Amino acid sequence: MSLRLGQIVDALGGSLEGGERDTEILRIAPLESSGPGDLSFLSNPRYQSQLAASQAACVIVAPAMRNAALERGACIVVEQPYTYFAHVTQLWVRAHGQGAPAGIHPSAVVDPQARVAPTASIGPLCVVERGAVIGAHTVLKSRVTVGERCTVGERCILHPGVVIGADGFGFAQQRGEWIKIEQLGAVRIGNDVEIGANTCIDRGALDDTVIEDGVKLDNLIQIAHNVHIGRHTAMAGCSAVAGSTRIGAHCTIAGAASIVGHLQLADNVHISTNTVVTHSITQPGQYTGVFPMDDNAKWEKNAATLRQLYRLRERIKALEQTRKDG
């Protein structure tokens, strides 16, 4: 498998400098381990030291790195090297026929009342239930389940073991017993969504659970019933969102972060790893917080004190200054 530098530049743009269009690229590789015949990229100037030592046939660089790249050989100069690299990987897959073939695998179970676009790919052991809709060019890899009446848009990728539309966790308590609340909603997934392996998105209790266009979900994520995730939000592995929470557009949720139910997060909110979000966030920005488990009454007192810590610090500093002045 190979591509020539001229083919890459013709397809994606960029300025090829210090090299020949017919140079053959055999592999896309990291800068530090690349060799002859490889195409690599430098997106962070901190790793410029690796550039001089790289054996890559060609390196994708920003204009600021052009001269340094030319000292070692060929380069493709673009404004956003990392984004260009992403497009190169897609071009590579298309050129070498590595994408999933359209059609339904013989071992998949698709209800006659489901609608699957002719260009969609339904992998081995998938289940698509009654009334479900799978959009054009969407790929369901092995063992994906799309539940009754759930909708998956166009150009989506669902990795192995994804479950769309299992019942949400809804129960009413009666005399010490749990009475199941039937989950009557569905799940609606927009276009260009990617969902990692073994992630679960539960159907809504009454209204639908909604995942908007361009959302990216990592492996092992739990999305509870009636959650609404805004467009182009990304969530890393082992994070979780409890029921009826609304997350805005262009947010990022780092690994193992948890968001409790019935909250609202504004657009462009960024949650750090292991953070537990317990109240709504109305302003864009980065939010971080980790607090140890304790008896609940003690935890509430300590948490309340912690929130006043900076104010207490300033009061102490003022008192100390008063003593010095006195």
Swiss-Prot record:
EC number, UniProt record: 2.3.1.191
Gene3D superfamilies in the cross-refs: Hexapeptide repeat proteins, MurE/MurF, N-terminal domain
Enzymatic reactions: a UDP-3-O-[(3R)-3-hydroxyacyl]-alpha-D-glucosamine + a (3R)-hydroxyacyl-[ACP] = a UDP-2-N,3-O-bis[(3R)-3-hydroxyacyl]-alpha-D-glucosamine + holo-[ACP] + H(+)
Swiss-Prot/TrEMBL GO biological process terms: lipid A biosynthetic process
Keyword Metal-binding included in the entry's annotation: no
Active site: H225 (proton acceptor)
GO function term, MF aspect, one: N-acyltransferase activity
Family: Belongs to the transferase hexapeptide repeat family. LpxD subfamily.
Subunit annotation: Homotrimer.
Entry-linked PANTHER family: UDP-3-O-ACYLGLUCOSAMINE N-ACYLTRANSFERASE, UDP-3-O-ACYLGLUCOSAMINE N-ACYLTRANSFERASE 1, MITOCHONDRIAL-RELATED
Protein known as: UDP-3-O-acylglucosamine N-acyltransferase
Biological source species: Acidovorax ebreus (strain TPSY) (Diaphorobacter sp. (strain TPSY))
